[in-house]
C-alpha cells in the first residue's frame, strides 16, 4: 500500500503547506449552501417520485473543486447510473474544505432541507482531517456520529473512504485507515475503500495541485464507484 501512495505523500506535503490559507471554516461559520441537483430538474412529480434520491455528502472531492459543475463527481455519477438503467437524482452536498467536524454540524440542516428522505447518502469526509493532522480518534468520533444519525433516520449509507499518506507516519495511518471499514461493518454501510484509488498517483488524472481529480480522473472514479452505488440502490 505504501508504495502505491508515494506520490500521494508529496501531494499531501504540498497541501499541508497551503492549509493555513485554504478554505477552512471557523466553527459556527461554515458555509452550508444549498443542496444542488447534479443535473437538470426532472419534469413531473410522478417521474421525480419514481427516481431514486442519492445525496453526495462530503468535501471538495464531491463538490467538484476545479472543474465545471457538470464535470463534478455527483453529476457524472448521475449520468453513469442512467446509462446502467438506474433512474436516480444525485444531489451535490459537497462543501470544499469541510472536515468531519464541519460535516457533522451541517448534516441535519442538509437532510432537513431535502424534499424527501434520500434512498442513499454517500459520505466522503476525512481527507481534510488528515491534511490538517487532526487526531484520528476525533475523525472516527465525528464519522461515527454522522453514520449514527443517518441510521437513526433509516437512510442507507455508502462510505467512500480516504487513506492517510505515507508521510503521515504509521502511528497516524493505522488508526486513520481503519476508520472506514470499521464503520461500514458497524453500520452495515456499503464501502468504496479509497475514493482516489488508481487516480491520485496518475498525474494525467489529477489537477495541477496533485490533490483533486481532473475531469478524466473523475470519470475513472465514477467508473469504479457506479456499480457499488447501483447495488446499494437495489431493493
PLM features per residue range, with description:
Residues 68, 98-101:
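Acidic-and-aromatic substrate-binding clefts and catalytic sites of carbohydrate-active enzymes
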Residues 86, 104-235:
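Alpha-helical cap/lid subdomain in secreted, periplasmic
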Residues 1-57, 67-68, 82-86, 115-117, ...:
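N-terminal secretory targeting modules
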Residues 64-72:
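Glycine- and acidic-residue-enriched helix-capping/strand-helix junction motifs
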Residues 17, 91, 158:
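Conserved Rossmann-like nucleotide-binding pocket used by diverse enzymes
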Residues 55-63, 93, 125:
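Acidic/histidine-rich, surface-exposed loop or edge segments in extracytoplasmic proteins
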Residues 87-99:
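A short beta-strand-loop structural module common to alpha/beta enzyme folds
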Residues 76-90:
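Signal peptide-proximal N-terminal region
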Amino acid at each position: 500500500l505504501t508504495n502505491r501512495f508515494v506520490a500521494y505523500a508529496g501531494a499531501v506535503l504540498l497541501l499541508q503547506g497551503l492549509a493555513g490559507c485554504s478554505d477552512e471554516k471557523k466553527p459556527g461559520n461554515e458555509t452550508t449552501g444549498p443542496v444542488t441537483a447534479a443535473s437538470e430538474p426532472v419534469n413531473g412529480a410522478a417521474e421525480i417520485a419514481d427516481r431514486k434520491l442519492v445525496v453526495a455528502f462530503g468535501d471538495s472531492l464531491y463538490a467538484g473543486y476545479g472543474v465545471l459543475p457538470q464535470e463534478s463527481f455527483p453529476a457524472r455519477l448521475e449520468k453513469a447510473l442512467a446509462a446502467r438503467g438506474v433512474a436516480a437524482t444525485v444531489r451535490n452536498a459537497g462543501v470544499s474544505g469541510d472536515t468531519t467536524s464541519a460535516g457533522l454540524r451541517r448534516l441535519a440542516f442538509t437532510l432537513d432541507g431535502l424534499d424527501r428522505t434520500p434512498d442513499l447518502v454517500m459520505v466522503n469526509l476525512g481527507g481534510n482531517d488528515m491534511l490538517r493532522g487532526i487526531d484520528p480518534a476525533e475523525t472516527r468520533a465525528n464519522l461515527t456520529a454522522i453514520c449514527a444519525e443517518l441510521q437513526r433516520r433509516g437512510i442507507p449509507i455508502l462510505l467512500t473512504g480516504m487513506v492517510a499518506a505515507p508521510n503521515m507516519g504509521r502511528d497516524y495511518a493505522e488508526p486513520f485507515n481503519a476508520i472506514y471499514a470499521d464503520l461500514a461493518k458497524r453500520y452495515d454501510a456499503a464501502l468504496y475503500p479509497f475514493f482516489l484509488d488508481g487516480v491520485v498517483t496518475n498525474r494525467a488524472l489529477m489537477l495541477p495541485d496533485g490533490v483533486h481529480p481532473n475531469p478524466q480522473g473523475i470519470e475513472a472514479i465514477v467508473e469504479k464507484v457506479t456499480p457499488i452505488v447501483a447495488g446499494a440502490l437495489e431493493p
